[in-house]
Amino acid sequence: MMTSLSLSIALLSKTDLVKISLRISTAFGISSCRDLA
């Protein structure tokens, strides 16, 4: 999962939109980790 995420970031890192989506993804990731923990 982390690998595909890294690849997606690498492919789309040229746009500011990705920076926004990355923040959203990170927020969801943290929430998911807390739910699983």
Curated annotation (Swiss-Prot):
It comes from the Eukaryota. This is Uncharacterized protein YLR163W-A. It comes from Saccharomyces cerevisiae (strain ATCC 204508 / S288c).
